[in-house]
Amino acid sequence: MDAAEVEFLAEKELVTIIPNFSLDKIYLIGGDLGPFNPGLPVDVPLWLAINLKQRQKCRLLPPEWMDVEKLEQMRDEERKEETFTPVPSPHYMEITKLLLNHASDNIPKADTIRTLIKDLWDTRMAKLRVSADSFVRQQEAHAKLDNLTLMEISSSGAFLTQALNHMYKLRTNLQPSESTQSQDF
């Protein structure tokens, strides 16, 4: 799965908007949305929120976790722990990217949030590289991927898969085949 597919999945996450228009419910295959009343918050999928924002039909409210203090705490905790810590959303990176690209005017301290999310991402990717290196060096057959997001797995998955395939080939070439006869008499 590539980054575009992961981002597509993230667009289904619900975010809160404050519409500036009136509309009864919208009936979609995935469920009903609305009603939309000016000034009253409503939860909608991210894809719809971005579409409405681009048409200047709403104001987006950032998710609860998209707060400078909370993100600083998460970043610091991630740096302290050896293992991956839980993240506030399984699509935190994609949601942040989309909201900051399309609605940064609705997000207080957007530049600081962008930096904190990037720091969190970099810390987690460094941990992932170290874990992958250790995994390959110890010739493990299984890995535990607790608290990793789909985007993090996707971004390192191709490399890790290739590395494991190469290790498998090396291991099978080094082992004596079953058809080889023993020299013992």
UniProtKB/Swiss-Prot annotation:
Residues bearing PTM N-acetylmethionine: M1
Keyword rRNA-binding listed: no
SUPFAM superfamilies from the UniProt entry: GINS helical bundle-like, PriA/YqbF domain
Phosphothreonine PTM positions: T180
Subcellular location: Nucleus; Chromosome
Sequence positions bearing Phosphoserine: S182
Annotated GO CC locations: CMG complex; GINS complex; nucleus
Cross-link (Glycyl lysine isopeptide (Lys-Gly) (interchain with G-Cter in SUMO2)): K109
Major subcellular location class: nucleus
One example of a Gene Ontology biological process annotation: DNA replication
This protein's record includes keyword Metal-binding: no
Keywords, ordered alphabetically: Acetylation, Chromosome, DNA replication, Isopeptide bond, Nucleus, Phosphoprotein, Ubl conjugation
InterPro entries: GINS_A, GINS_bundle-like_dom_sf, GINS_Psf2, PSF2_N
Annotated Gene3D superfamilies: 1.20.58.1020, 3.40.5.50
Record family assignment: Belongs to the GINS2/PSF2 family.
General function of this protein: Required for correct functioning of the GINS complex, a complex that plays an essential role in the initiation of DNA replication, and progression of DNA replication forks. GINS complex is a core component of CDC45-MCM-GINS (CMG) helicase, the molecular machine that unwinds template DNA during replication, and around which the replisome is built.
Subunit-structure text: Component of the GINS complex which is a heterotetramer of GINS1, GINS2, GINS3 and GINS4. Forms a stable subcomplex with GINS3. GINS complex interacts with DNA primase in vitro. Component of the CMG helicase complex, a hexameric ring of related MCM2-7 subunits stabilized by CDC45 and the tetrameric GINS complex.
Protein name, as recorded: DNA replication complex GINS protein PSF2
Source organism (scientific name): Mus musculus (Mouse)
Organism taxonomic ancestry: Eukaryota, Metazoa, Chordata, Craniata, Vertebrata
